[in-house]
Amino acid sequence: MKRIILTYTLAFSLLSAYAGEGGSPPLKNTDKSLLIDYVDPFIGTTNFGTTNPGAICPNGMMSVVPFNVMGSSENTYDKDARWWSTPYEYTNCFFTGYAHVNLSGVGCPELGSLLLMPTTGELNVDYKEYGSKYKDEQASPGYYSNYLTKYNVKTEVSATPRSGI
């Protein structure tokens, strides 16, 4: 009985070794795209999806996100109490600043955000006055930018695990 088990074990070992050695050559990756190229930060940023396309570092302490849900008659959710659940709504185009500690996709209010707004000219603290329409919005993992038409300024933010700039 031991001889039969030993014979089968030896045969199986030889076949396994041969199967690993031979066969077709290893496949080469001819596609030069990276997995990061398939990420769309704008998924879930409308219809109260509560996500944002900001500069966010995975598992990091910092998330620099655009705030655009208040301040303009063109914003569809400005007078709706539900806008408190998210700092960003894709269909709105009135930018009021960057928040640095918002979470994405939590589905509940995140109040008390300190907004930073790049502006030029006289200081104005009324968000309906200092806010600006924007265009040329771009986002990728860890990066967000837009162009503020009122101030003729391109804004860019990025995040690392412990800081955002």
Spans of features found by a protein language model:
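Positively charged n-region of N-terminal signal peptides that target proteins for export
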Residues: 1-4
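General helical structural elements
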Residues: 6-7, 86
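Bacterial Sec-dependent signal peptides at the C-terminal "C-region" and cleavage site
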Residues: 16-28
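Bacterial N-terminal signal peptides
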Residues: 7-16
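Accessory carbohydrate-recognition regions in carbohydrate-active enzymes
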Residues: 25-165
